[in-house]
Amino acid sequence: QIAHSLTMIGGSRPDNNTTVNASLVTDDHKAGIYLFGQGRHRASYDHDGDGYSELGKLEAKTLGFRSYLKTSNYSKLTFEYHNISEFRRGGNLLDLPPHETDITEQTDHQINGGGLKFDLFSRNYHHRLNVYTSAQHTKRQSYYGAGKDPNAYGNTTDMTFIGGVQYSYEWDKCLFMPATFTGGAEYSYDDLQDEMLGYHRTIAQTVHIGSAFAQNEWKNDRWSFLIGGRLDKHNMMDHVIFSPRANVRFNPTKDINLRMSYSSGFRAPQAFDEDLHITAVGGDVAIIQISPDLKEENSQSVSASVDFYHRFGPVQVNFLVEGFYTDLRNVFILEEIGRDEDNNLLMERRNGKGARVMGINLEGKMAYSWMQIQAGATLQRSRYKEAEQWSENPNITPQKKMFRSPDVYGYFTSTFTPVKRFSASLTGTYTGSMLVQHLAGYIPEDREEKTRDFFDLNLKLAYDFPIFKSVTLQVNAGVQNIFDSYQDDFDKGAHRDAGYIYGPGIPRSYFVGCKISY
């Protein structure tokens, strides 16, 4: 299959995307390979004409394969490899070297990764053994700078490795009903080296995590009970984390599914990808550092749902109502702590007192012979347990509401095939109003902004032309963000807050494409 699409962002800036994939299988189906590749070129986009991009330019190439080999009737070897080359740049004067511009954020990634997996089954398929390993190496060259800074270049290397084993057993009867036991162990390694000498920042972080897990699920047509847990030992923590989970399902009728679940998890006190990012603010930059007293973030979650399935003649419907509640302890927050000797803004990742996230999720699906519709809406409340002070501006009071967390959001997807070779897709997302942090620079002082809500509606029309018996050409076209529901208050100029971006990713854009399938 070969496909290409051209999207005109804002009706003026091109985004070209080409994909190629192919599947090959031997006649006896004992071996197969899936090849894939992608090339993408996106021009930068300046929405307000100030010479600074709201969408950076992008050059990306991906090449890889996934393959399998059946070593016997009850065993299979699977291996995968991928290479990703990605260049991104935003700011102004994009044709000049970064250190000759007012603002540039630029990254150049080279990623190589792969994995190997072996599956072994018993003759009756009651026993299954899975052994797996994967590794990935990332090399990144970056520039995050403002004011023609010649020292804002950086280098990052990251090496990750995961290896593990998983065993499962199917019980015909365990105590009171059929069950499946799953257990295993896993080891993960991550070595991160990040240097930005111009900002006096060096991160040398090596992470080792050893894990063991087990669960048992009893299940029949009417009931299911799951209980399990996971043990994790992180080398940056002096204790073992136990994360239990449980789930109960009950079907009073074949059309109704009742479910309750509990789960827990944690986030380790380590540097993550978002902590490596440096944002231009007020003609300088904002640098994130990790508090030496940072503790792990813990979560406890419960949910309950009712799932209804029914067929009304030729129409199939599904409706879901779900309530959820998550309690976060030692929640990670980001606070201003002053400026360094070069007047760069310092942001510290530290622990807050905690937070609670709760809400209701509603989803519905309907399928007819030539039409499928799915829609969902979430009503959510995300609050810190105690108001958190994020800015040094004394005019900003501490805030309990989580930033960039709307109380209402939703989506819908629909596909129509009124005639055999023609299809139409109409999709949309709704994002409610939310609070966003806006840092001083273009504006005189830090402030909290309450955004408007957004409705992003997209339309795609496609028609398939049969060329030969096994060859089909599809031609498609459409519009993204039909109502041009897009942010209209970007900062301008060299003193902008580059992180003050919210809402849909692109303005109203038009696209055409074609696809050849063999």
Language model: regions and residue ranges:
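Outer-membrane beta-barrel translocator/receptor signature
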Residues: Q1-G49, G56-L63, Y74, S470
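Transmembrane beta-barrel strands of outer-membrane/channel proteins
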Residues: L6-G10, L35-H41, F79-N83, V131-H137, ...
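Membrane-embedded beta-barrel scaffold of Gram-negative outer-membrane proteins
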Residues: H29, L35, R128-Y144, R259, ...
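C-terminal beta-signal and adjacent terminal beta-strands/loops
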Residues: R329-N330, Y430-L439, Y463-Y518
